[in-house]
Amino acid sequence: MENPSALPIKLQPSNLRPIAYRILSKKHGLNIQTDALKLLTDAVSYKFGFDWKSTQSQQFLEEIAKIWKKQDRGIFIDGPGLKQVIKELSDRNTNQISTRNGSADNLAKKAERSDTLVDNDAENEPVNNAENTLNWQDYFKVINPDEQPNYKYDKHRKQLSFIPSTNAKRLANNLNSNVDYFNNRYHLISDRLSRNENFQKPSFSSISSISKSLSHNNKTNEITLIKNVLGRDGSKFILFGLLSKNANDDFILEDSTDHIELNLTQAYKTEGSFYCPGMFVIVEGIYSASGGSMSNANVIGGCFHVSNIGHPPAERRELSMENYGNLDFMGINRDNDTNNNDNHILRVNKSLKKKLVSLEKTLVNHKLIILGSDCFLDDLKILDGIKKLFGKIESSLIDDETNQPLVIVLIGSFTSNPLTPTNSSVANVSNTENYKSNFDNLSNILSNFPNIVQKVKIALIPGINDPWQSSHSLGGSNLNAFPQRSIPKIFTNRLERLLPKGNLIAGWNPLRINYLSQEIVLMKDDIINKFKRNDIIFSNDLELEQLKLQKDKNDDGLIHATDINTKEPHISPKIKQARKLVKTILDQGNLQPFLKDIRIINTNFDYSLRIEPLPTILILNDATFPTFEVTYNGCKVINTGKLVGNNRKLSFVEYFPSGKKFEFKEVYF
């Protein structure tokens, strides 16, 4: 494309504007800004010189337009974005010149094949060099947060933008990520609500429909920004924002424009959810210009008397993926992409998705085994149970080689006491040695089962007692930063030497598994206790409890036949609590929907806590709650429970991806 004999010249933006308008604006529907036009003029002047009107120059603009559109950069071409696109194009062309002798035609074809965005249509595939053959192993990956692509919601363009990896070990939060943490959550949920038909602005097709609407006093569920309630005393509104507290310990609601004090004395909550500070909620009520405890010029005065409060409803995975343009949130296409640059957007096109779904339905023998929480390797009773389980798996592998699990996931904490430093240096060394010996014992057990060692991957997910965070958190979850990094290799090196290369997976918490078309999220946290401790108790809740206690007192604990509703199915308290937990997490679209004083978040990896779009499977590993399986908005959520309770019974779960089926199993030892 680049003519080596052409001498650079100095063009003015006005010279290139007609060509840029014809190609970028008229043909591709893009608008180039002034700074970008100047940058493009300089690039064309340097690359093509007196041949700036040639077909090669126009092809250069064509390629820029293709990449810009396929990267979803919006309709406005700005300077910084154009600079990045030109650099990527130049780097690619340089590699092609060295391998293909600089042929202009070959360069153009290569550019089309190696666009930074993989979004092939069905008619111009192949996807993986073979149109009708896919290797399932290419689409089975265990993904830690530092390997997961980072997409950030752009409130101006109303879409997700890819944030390139810095390839740096980000140990601590930076200022920007801390500031953007709640902003990102707000804008992402706000965008979800804008697609929900229950919160759409009214549309009228005729004057008669407007008159009919006014005559019937039809009310809409349009969400109002907090700044727009000022001066509208006594009016009814629906607001959306972050629920938190101010300096006076009063509840406030905050959105992107302002915050306002809430009066919750008459509030009725939507049943089936927890309501904690740090969650984004929808409130309905009446604004009063008086009555607020905070009265200064910097905030909206008065208070908002809430009548109803609820969560923003979750959106099904298929709809979210479609609205976000089928982005590759798991990076499964990265290894199959011809471009070596990791810092670019990838997509999972519909044709590939259909092939993956069809393929996974044929792999009926594939399964994942997830053990219960708190796999204390310093407990001899638990080691006996693990030995019994591994023996059972080994026997099944000998009887039927096709019935092998793809991965066995062990959930921490892997020690019953947190690994902490002590005043004595000798004791401190002893603590780490004891912790390392726990995994050495696991290696000794595994060495007796050669089929498991050779054929099955082992994944480790840390808990609150595992290093290195346990050294300062002392096993307390409120001081344990999330996401939690994997267990250091110094403790698992013997286990790593035993297993074939790549078969030991040192996972983070949370951890993601991509199985063909499915996204599986695993998190170890005793989260239901956090919800219960921080759940807001409304005045109406107390009144209902008092009425219930009074009724029980009057009836002397007797149940009358008239009180039994035979039409409604009986739901156990455990399932009610499980549904409440699942609905809260999925509606919030975040694994840790709390304020930072409840849970410390490493905001550099906050995107790994986002569950929007909803995952296919969410596996909670809460040792304080029994096992359950609940489906909400197409997302299946389970809890594995505790690995070993008071009896000699080891609990684990088998998941069969082909049918999305779980089997809760137990081994007695």
From Swiss-Prot:
Source organism of the structure: Debaryomyces hansenii (strain ATCC 36239 / CBS 767 / BCRC 21394 / JCM 1990 / NBRC 0083 / IGC 2968)
Protein name (database record): DNA polymerase epsilon subunit B
GO BP: DNA-templated DNA replication maintenance of fidelity; error-prone translesion synthesis
The family this protein is said to belong to: Belongs to the DNA polymerase epsilon subunit B family.
Function: As accessory component of the DNA polymerase epsilon (DNA polymerase II) participates in chromosomal DNA replication.
Gene from which this protein is expressed: DPB2
Assembly information from the UniProt record: Heterotetramer. Consists of four subunits: POL2, DPB2, DPB3 and DPB4.
Coiled coil: none
A Pfam family of this chain: DNA_pol_E_B
Keyword hit for Secreted: no
GO cellular component, one term: nuclear replication fork
Subcellular location: Nucleus
